Amino acid sequence: MAEFTPITIAYGDGIGPEIMEAVLYILRKAEARIRLETIEVGEKLYKKHYTSGISEESWESIQRTGIILKAPITTPQGGGYKSLNVTIRKTLQLFANIRPSVSFHPFTMTLHPHLNLTIIRENEEDLYAGIEYRQTHNMYESIKLISHTGCEKIIRYAFEYAVKNNRKKVTCLSKDNIMKFSDGVFHKIFNEIAKEYPQINNEHYIIDIGTARLATKPEIFDVIVTSNLYGDIISDVAAEISGSVGLAGSANIGQHYAMFEAVHGSAPDIAGKDIANPSGLLNAAIMMLVHIGQGDIASLIENAWKKTIEDGVHTADIYNEQNSSKKVGTKEFAEEVTKRLGQIPTKLPKADYPLIAEKQESNIDYKIDTNEVKKLVGTDIFVNMNISSAHDIADKINKLDLGNIELKTISSKGLKLWPRDTRFETISDHWCCRFMNKDGTEIKHLDITRLLEALSKANIDFIKVENLFEFDGVAGYSLAQGE
């Protein structure tokens, strides 16, 4: 008797329920060997005051099955709500987001008939950590977190993906010409890991020109690996230029869990109209079937779907007079796919997936390297003062008895404003005051607490402390522009 794999199903919001029903209909007709558990997430949960959009009962189902097929959800705009997608990815440590983009020319309209690439996006870190603060009346902060281990995991995954899927090249996208620490370590680790895969070509682009090339010459790319925010943006670009965002599915992979979803959003403006294209979620379900070792069913469905596309049976988003023969709605599209189960596409590539479940490499022990000597050499204290001249702030601080510690620089938004030859004025209430020992020696935490006490007694409103470290004698902090 065939073994059935338990799967957690989330119907989502907007067009989610109708495209999920269409996909489940196809899975049933194809006799996928899965057992479904349904959970409620998203908008209904937000309205019940679950700020993350998911309940404990839903988490229990996910922990039981380890696999989620999720339709798009709607995250309410404004404060107080967390993105459910980000919550699930981080909680389940789904570090890799895999987003294939393929042209189905000539059956869908695209300017790039040879587009066939996969974007591997880091899923847990970067600005999507969601750590934000309002520090003053004028200034807001969002923290970009990038770890050495996080970079190593996603970059190694990208090269392993290239090897397993017969890809020839991996391209890294970063902005390390500006963000020399966070994006710099991503690029550095990419170069190091690339040496372990001499059979795979590698290259690097700055994200801006890389995105421009992706939009105009996508056929030059094969596998792209990048950090969270950049990956989110460029995967939508790639999906759009392939012919329709509605065709793209994605996988979120971790060591113990996996989630599969469409790239597109919940599109509440067309919800309930039976016009949404279920192909994105269907392609995500195909990726899920491959992941759990049901490559036979995945191939059966993908070939039927491709034959449907070849036959010109299209939903409104990809329908065109030149290549389409019939415009159908969500339900009818699913029915047309099932009519073609067992058929093979004649022009698009035939799918033939293995019957082996995908497993994450477990022999790599990702550890935090603590061999570098870490030395505390200073501190940046951010202060809230509604004043136009950094010289006035310096005058006030320099009157204080700070012992061996001295004020080195004052900057605002990364620009050094003191000491300068001219009294440059700026509109700011957010100032970074950099302190170090006069003799350049190591400082102690007690020195910093005494410094904060002195600032407090002088009624200087400090809002943040960022300590400055050297690692093996190399500065672990950036200099302000002009410093």
UniProtKB/Swiss-Prot annotation:
EC top class, as a word: oxidoreductase
Keyword presence, Transit peptide: no
Binding sites annotated in the UniProt record for NADP(+): 74, 264-270, 277
Cofactor(s) needed by this chain: Mg(2+); Mn(2+)
Any one GO molecular function term: isocitrate dehydrogenase (NADP+) activity
SUPFAM superfamilies documented for this protein: Isocitrate/Isopropylmalate dehydrogenase-like (SSF53659)
Keywords, sorted A to Z: Glyoxylate bypass, Magnesium, Manganese, Metal-binding, NADP, Oxidoreductase, Tricarboxylic acid cycle
Catalytic activity: D-threo-isocitrate + NADP(+) = 2-oxoglutarate + CO2 + NADPH
Cofactor binding: number and manner: Binds 1 Mg(2+) or Mn(2+) ion per subunit.
Positions with a binding annotation for D-threo-isocitrate: 83, 85, 89, 99, 121
Record-listed E.C. numbers: 1.1.1.42
A GO biological process held by the record: isocitrate metabolic process
Annotated site location: Critical for catalysis: 128, 175
Highest rank taxon of the organism: Bacteria
Residues where Mg(2+) binds: 232
NCBIfam families in the cross-refs: ICDH_alpha, PRK09222.1
Protein family per UniProt: Belongs to the isocitrate and isopropylmalate dehydrogenases family.
Subunit structure of this chain's protein: Homodimer.
Function summary: Catalyzes the oxidative decarboxylation of isocitrate to 2-oxoglutarate and carbon dioxide with the concomitant reduction of NADP(+).
Protein name: Isocitrate dehydrogenase [NADP]
